[in-house]
Amino acid sequence: MSCGDKIRIAIVVSEFNYDVTRVMEEKAIDHARFLGAEVSLVARSPGTFDTPFIVSRLLATHSEVDAVAVLGAVIKGDTKHDEVVAHQAARKLLDLSIEYGKPVTLGIIGPGASRLEAIERAEEYARRAVESAVKLARRSKELSGEC
């Protein structure tokens, strides 16, 4: 791959809190196009906690993907469940990035976010996750001598 080739990203979207993540998905795709990247695959996960499994399968079977942006919204409830979900997903996503040698970026709102806060943050988190994925993929190619 030359430096002029497009970066190919995959987007993994949690279906839980879909009123928020649907907006995130749309904004992420728009921002990837703006950055000149190709969204080669959009995969859905039942919830944020499940995203590492989807990312693992995706990276194991789609070698053409340069990076993955993960989108989710973990809304605060009456217990600390939101903290467990967000922290465990984040930790495992980082592990997968290291394991596969490909960027996996975190566009997960929460823990501790209200529904209103999640709605307000949706576009920003989606854009930041995609931008990080594209930048990291480019830098990875530079470091590996592909550019």
UniProtKB/Swiss-Prot annotation:
One of its GO terms (molecular function) is 6,7-dimethyl-8-ribityllumazine synthase activity. 5-amino-6-(D-ribitylamino)uracil binds at F16, T48, F49, D50, A73, V74, I75, L106. It is an enzyme of class 2 (transferase). Pathway: Cofactor biosynthesis; riboflavin biosynthesis; riboflavin from 2-hydroxy-3-oxobutyl phosphate and 5-amino-6-(D-ribitylamino)uracil: step 1/2. The active site is at H81 (proton donor). GO terms for biological process: riboflavin biosynthetic process. It catalyses: (2S)-2-hydroxy-3-oxobutyl phosphate + 5-amino-6-(D-ribitylamino)uracil = 6,7-dimethyl-8-(1-D-ribityl)lumazine + phosphate + 2 H2O + H(+). GO terms for cellular component: riboflavin synthase complex. Its EC number is 2.5.1.78. Catalyzes the formation of 6,7-dimethyl-8-ribityllumazine by condensation of 5-amino-6-(D-ribitylamino)uracil with 3,4-dihydroxy-2-butanone 4-phosphate. This is the penultimate step in the biosynthesis of riboflavin. This is 6,7-dimethyl-8-ribityllumazine synthase. It comes from Aeropyrum pernix (strain ATCC 700893 / DSM 11879 / JCM 9820 / NBRC 100138 / K1).
